[in-house]
Structure formats: structure tokens, C-alpha cells
């Protein structure tokens, strides 16, 4: 294992030796030093000891410190050599980096590159690296540099610790403070951002690996399950959304702000709620919010799948359509035979569309509207509805196109629209589009002839989709799906 200390060196004038040394303490370790970098370096050498030595000291020097004749480095080199000799420590290898005359951010880029290359050179011989950061020295703008450096090195997976020398000029005493927590807070911020931007809880689990709070542990478990549900497009997303809401509330109520720095995750809870549209009564709007979140974060395949898995439930549970089961229950239950219970609401809607199909083509006055005589009179009434409902595998895919013509005049008795028929037509058209788009994404192939006919019919009915026929891109699918979500929300708003 290799230990590397990185310091931004503060200028130290010879006349300060006359002012006397400071006594710095950290728990059971006490060191005497005139200069803050000296204090941190002596503390770290003492803490590591002779057996677990400090191997390399990377020293970032400003122009003032590096100027010929300056006393700073002369003093530090001599004092550390003396200190190591007296205590049986090995003097670390020095690697000096000079800020130079570059414009501020250019020199930061150069210095970061030099330090990164040196650390990688050391890691080539021994990848087990621990980085120690001396936060006590340098000019004020070096804090920005240290933050950038910490972020850069953390991506390599190194263990990082930070220290600050806090002195009382009146009493000539000071404390060596471990400032690891500030970087842990940054890890939490990054982890929460990873969750709200990409739906991943892996970084959160790592950031809170040592937290003992039952509420936080339960929240992390729920966030991981929620993340899995999004990634796998699971059907239990509504349940996971409700559980996440409950666990966020538990942390808000029962976790002390100051316990183990957990205030940071509490501070991020409003962001989590906002990004995922989480509220105590999310329901269908919560699912719509998650689909929208997927679209906003480039998860188009997940958005299409989650939408398709939930659209029937939203339409039925939100009562956009009402079905009198006394009238239609027997037929629907027969269609449900051998189907999974989760398909119940989808089956109800397919049944309604099938009856609309029947009513449309039993009407002698209905125009064909062309398009190959309305798709070959719906493929000869879908082979007479596959022998009049005799086979449960009849082609739902073909007759759901009836949704495009969905009009209250075709509704069977006992079925009622609770939103305007034009809006309902759009919602069914959206759902048809989402199926076509998902099939194309999942199968990684071009849409087939029948889907082309469907999209052409959409366009004839003045409801064009950006993604078809020749512009099937994530950007255009996202645009079409956002419009689909807007239509659903309009329907929910009009119903309330």
C-alpha cells in the first residue's frame, strides 16, 4: 500500500520563527509546528508511524513559494528531515508541482494533469493507494482546486482522507481536524444526482454503507428496489413508488439532521420527490411522472415499456371509460380464461375495442375512408372475429386500430366515455403508437407493413407522429411520447 500526501504550500517567512511555535493536537497525537502545512505533515507522519510510512509528498507551490531565495521550502525540507530523523520515520519522496504564470483555470488544468499522472505512475507499481489531502495551506482559490482534485481522484477508486490545521493565534494552540465528512457530503450529492438522473441506487448504497439508522437503511433498500423496477420495467412500479414515498416520509420525520451527516440526504428529499413526481397520492400521475422522467433522462425503452404496461390500468382505474360489468362481465371473464390476472384491465379495453369494431362494420353507412378500403375491411372483419370470440388468441393487434375511429356512436350499451371522445381517440392512438414504437425498439428492426398502415392511417386522420415513417429517433419518439403523456394528463384534469 502507498500513502500519498498532497499539499498546497503556504508561504512562510523567516521572521515568523521569532513568534514561537504552535501546539497542535488530534486525540492522542500532539505536534509542534510553526506553519500549517508543517503541522499536517508532522501529524500524518506520526499517525502512520514507521511501519506504515508516508511514501510521497506532492507539493503544489505558488510563484511566491517557488521564488529563488524564498525561505518556505528551505524551512520545510530541513524541519521534516529533522523530525523524521528524531522519530525513526522515513523522509517521503517529494514531487513538486509549480503553479507558474498561466491564467488561473489553465494552470489548474495543467496542475491537475501533472498530479494525476504522478499518482497513476505510482499506482502502476502498487494500485493500493491512499490519498491524504492537506487542506490547511495555499491561497484561498486553492479550495476550488482541491475540490476538483478530489473529484478526479475519487473516480479512480482511491481512498481519500483530508485534514485541516485550525490554530488559535492567542493561545498558540491548534487542532488537526479530519475533514473527510465534507467529501462524504459530496459523495452523497453525487449519489442522489445519480439516482434522480439515471435511476441508479448503487452509489447511494456505497455512500451510506456505514450508516446504522434503520430508517435510512429501509429507504436505501426501497430506492434500490425502485431503481430495479425502473431498469427492468417491472409491473410493480406503482407499489414501489408508494413505498418510496413512505420511506422518504420516515426519514423526514425520524432521522436527526446531525446524525452521521444525514442532513444531506434529508436536504435532497424534496429534489427526489420533485424529479419522480412523488406525492402521498401519486397514483396514476406518479406513473405518468416516471415515464416523463425516463424520457427526460434518455431512457426511451423504459419509458415505452412502462407506458405500455400501465396505460390500460390508468384508463380503467381512473374511469376514463366506464364498463358495466353486469352487461359485459360474462364475455370479459371468458376472455380472461387462461390469462394472467395482471392482464385484466388490458383485456377489458380490448373487449371494448372489439365491440367498437363490431359496431363500426355492422353499420352499413360507415365510409371506408379509403386506405386500401380501410385495411381490407379490417382483414375481412378480422376473419369474422376469429370465429366469433372462439379463440382467445384472436388478433387484438389488428382490431385495436378501431381506436382511431373511436366515437361514442360506436360504443356498445353499458360502456361510457368520461372524457371527450376526441381526446379519447388521441389517447388510444397514443397507445397504439407506443406499442409500435416499443416493438421496433425491442426487436431492433424496421416496422412491418401492417404497422406502416397504422401510422399512415394516423396521419390521414390528422394525428401525425414525429417518429414515422422515416424519422424514428430517440428525440422524435420522446417528443411523441411527451405529447401522449400530455393527453393523459388533460384527461385526468378534465375528470377531476
Report each predicted region and the residues it spans:
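Long, low-complexity, Lys/Arg-enriched
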Residues: 1-130, 145-496
Amino acid at each position: 500500500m502507498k500513502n500519498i500526501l498532497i499539499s498546497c504550500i503556504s508561504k512562510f517567512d523567516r521572521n515568523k520563527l521569532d513568534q514561537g511555535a504552535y501546539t497542535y493536537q488530534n486525540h492522542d497525537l500532539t505536534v509542534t509546528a510553526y506553519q500549517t502545512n508543517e503541522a499536517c505533515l508532522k501529524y500524518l507522519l506520526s499517525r502512520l508511524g514507521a511501519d506504515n510510512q508516508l511514501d510521497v509528498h506532492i507539493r503544489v507551490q505558488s510563484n511566491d513559494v517557488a521564488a529563488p531565495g524564498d525561505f518556505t521550502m528551505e524551512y520545510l525540507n530541513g524541519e521534516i528531515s529533522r523530525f523524521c530523523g528524531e522519530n525513526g520515520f522515513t523522509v517521503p519522496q517529494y514531487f513538486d508541482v509549480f503553479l507558474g504564470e498561466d491564467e488561473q483555470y489553465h494552470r489548474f488544468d495543467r496542475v491537475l494533469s501533472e498530479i494525476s499522472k504522478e499518482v497513476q505512475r505510482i499506482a502502476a507499481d502498487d494500485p493500493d493507494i491512499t490519498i491524504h489531502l492537506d487542506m490547511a495551506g495555499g491561497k484561498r482559490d486553492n479550495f476550488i482546486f482541491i475540490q476538483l482534485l478530489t473529484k478526479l481522484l475519487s473516480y479512480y477508486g482511491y481512498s481519500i482522507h483530508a485534514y485541516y490545521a485550525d490554530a488559535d493565534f492567542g493561545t498558540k494552540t491548534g487542532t488537526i481536524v479530519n475533514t473527510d465528512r465534507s467529501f462524504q457530503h459530496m459523495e452523497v450529492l453525487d449519489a442522489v444526482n445519480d439516482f434522480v438522473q439515471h435511476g441508479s441506487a448503487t452509489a447511494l448504497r456505497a455512500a451510506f454503507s456505514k450508516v446504522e439508522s434503520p430508517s435510512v437503511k429501509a429507504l436505501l433498500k426501497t430506492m434500490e428496489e425502485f431503481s430495479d423496477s425502473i431498469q427492468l420495467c417491472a409491473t410493480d412500479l406503482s407499489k414501489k413508488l408508494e413505498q418510496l414515498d413512505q420511506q422518504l416520509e420516515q426519514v423526514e420525520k425520524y432521522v436527526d439532521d446531525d446524525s452521521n451527516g444525514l442532513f444531506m440526504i434529508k436536504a435532497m428529499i424534496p429534489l427526489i420527490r420533485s424529479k419522480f413526481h412523488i406525492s402521498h397520492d401519486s397514483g396514476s400521475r406518479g406513473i405518468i411522472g416516471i415515464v416523463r422522467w425516463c424520457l427526460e433522462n434518455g431512457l426511451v425503452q423504459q419509458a415505452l415499456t412502462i407506458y405500455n404496461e400501465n396505460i390500460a390500468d390508468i384508463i380503467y382505474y381512473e374511469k376514463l371509460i366506464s364498463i358495466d360489468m353486469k352487461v359485459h362481465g360474462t364475455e370479459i371473464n371468458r376472455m380472461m380464461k387462461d390469462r394472467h390476472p395482471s392482464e385484466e384491465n388490458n383485456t377489458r379495453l380490448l373487449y371494448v375495442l372489439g365491440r367498437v369494431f363490431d359496431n363500426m362494420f355492422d353499420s352499413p353507412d360507415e365510409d371506408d375512408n379509403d386506405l386500401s378500403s380501410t385495411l381490407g375491411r379490417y382483414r375481412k372483419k378480422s376473419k369474422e372475429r376469429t370465429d366469433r370470440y372462439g379463440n382467445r388468441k384472436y388478433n387484438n393487434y389488428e382490431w385495436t386500430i378501431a381506436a382511431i375511429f373511436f366515437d361514442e356512436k360506436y360504443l356498445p350499451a353499458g360502456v361510457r366515455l368520461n372524457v371527450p371522445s376526441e381526446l379519447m381517440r388521441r389517447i388510444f392512438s397514443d397507445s397504439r403508437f407506443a406499442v409500435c414504437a416499443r416493438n421496433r425498439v425491442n426487436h431492433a428492426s424496421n416496422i412491418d407493413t401492417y404497422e406502416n398502415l397504422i401510422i399512415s392511417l394516423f396521419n390521414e386522420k390528422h394525428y401525425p407522429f414525429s417518429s414515422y415513417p422515416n424519422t424514428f429517433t430517440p428525440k422524435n419518439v420522446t417528443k411523441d411520447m411527451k405529447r401522449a403523456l400530455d393527453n393523459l394528463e388533460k384527461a385526468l384534469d378534465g375528470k377531476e
